[in-house]
From Swiss-Prot:
Keywords: Amidation, Disulfide bond, Secreted, Signal
Source taxonomy: Eukaryota, Metazoa, Ecdysozoa, Arthropoda, Chelicerata
Residue ranges of the propeptide: 98-103
Residue list for modification Arginine amide: 97
Family: Belongs to the scorpion La1-like peptide family.
Organism: Urodacus yaschenkoi
Name assigned to this protein: La1-like protein 15
Length: 103
């Protein structure tokens, strides 16, 4: 009898886990003209960022990831990323006197 109750519990637990995994299956995040499936990401065509479509606690969420702002130290400068590159290659870099500047 103990084995039967353990088996029933395991089957119920497996069904619940499968249901929670497929609950957002097929869901899409809409960002402007972009449709991003849950679990996927796409670069922002208009800027240096990317969007991620996520499923969390039975909710569909959109996460926007952008370049971080940098506090420049003395002797350093911010260099813009190359135009036309996708995130994160489009983010600015920091160059400081010394090795990077060849001095």
């Amino acid at each position: 009898m103990k084995h039967l109750s353990d088996a029933v519990f395991f089957v119920c637990l497996s069904i619940c886990a499968l249901f929670s995994l497929t609950l957002c299956d097929g869901e899409i995040c809409q960002v402007g003209n972009m449709a991003i499936p849950v679990g996927k990401e796409q670069p922002d065509p208009k800027g240096c960022a990317k969007y991620e479509c996520l499923s969390q606690s039975n909710r569909v969420l959109i996460k926007k990831v952008t370049c971080a702002s940098q506090a420049l130290k003395r002797g350093c400068k911010s260099v813009p990323g190359p135009a036309g590159k996708r995130f994160p290659e489009c983010c600015p870099t920091t160059l400081c006197r010394g090795k990077q500047w060849g001095q």
